[in-house]
């Protein structure tokens, strides 16, 4: 078998973007560049677990450019970040909204970054409800619990009070990178990578 055939077989079913993400993964860089759903959450959780198993002492860098999405899928990513023995450095770029903002602020303290033109948006979680009156009441109770839990966690990560987070997230609250730093969502605004892109 020639080298060309081997290379063609190795790359079969893999497009250019797949090979870029594979290369980034080898550098301990993972990327959330879509809406948060179960599929991307499972992929990111698996990547965090893999990198944690390979070397539990080295940082993992999570780059976020996401409009948000599913609360349960996002919480799976968040819990895996906290479960990992590795520090998770988070980088907000482009847009980190809703669950994207939550994951950005949930990175390891001191290692949460925003690029200068990133926009960050915080708001309360939203959910569609339906069914019988009893079902709707149960869903409303679950939703209120989720809203409270997320506000408590954001308060813990930002240093803001629970009351302030509840007030500020009642409607869409937009931040520039610098405003996000002042609020406590990120620790640093960075314009260029100093040294390797991963920590």
Swiss-Prot record:
The active site is at residues 98, 123. One of its GO terms (cellular component) is endopeptidase Clp complex. This is ATP-dependent Clp protease proteolytic subunit 2. Its EC number is 3.4.21.92. It is found in: Cytoplasm. HAMAP family: ClpP. It holds the Pfam family CLP_protease. The gene is clpP2.
């Amino acid at each position: 078998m020639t080298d060309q055939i081997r290379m063609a077989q190795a790359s079969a079913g893999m497009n250019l973007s797949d090979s870029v993400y594979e290369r980034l993964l080898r550098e301990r860089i993972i990327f959330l560049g879509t809406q948060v759903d179960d599929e991307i959450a499972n992929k990111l959780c698996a990547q965090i677990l893999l990198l944690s198993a390979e070397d539990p002492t080295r940082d993992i860098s999570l780059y976020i450019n996401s409009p948000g999405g599913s609360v349960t899928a996002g919480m799976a990513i968040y819990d895996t970040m906290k479960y990992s023995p590795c520090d998770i450095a988070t980088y907000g770029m482009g847009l980190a909204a809703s669950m994207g903002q939550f994951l950005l602020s949930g990175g390891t303290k001191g290692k949460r970054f925003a690029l200068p033109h990133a926009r960050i948006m915080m708001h309360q979680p939203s959910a569609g409800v339906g069914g019988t009156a009893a079902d709707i009441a149960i869903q409303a109770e679950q939703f209120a619990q989720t809203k409270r839990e997320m506000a408590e966690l954001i308060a813990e990560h930002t240093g803001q009070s629970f009351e302030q987070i509840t007030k500020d997230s009642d409607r869409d609250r937009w931040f520039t990178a610098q405003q996000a730093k002042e609020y406590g969502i990120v620790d640093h605004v960075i314009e260029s990578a100093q040294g390797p892109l991963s920590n």
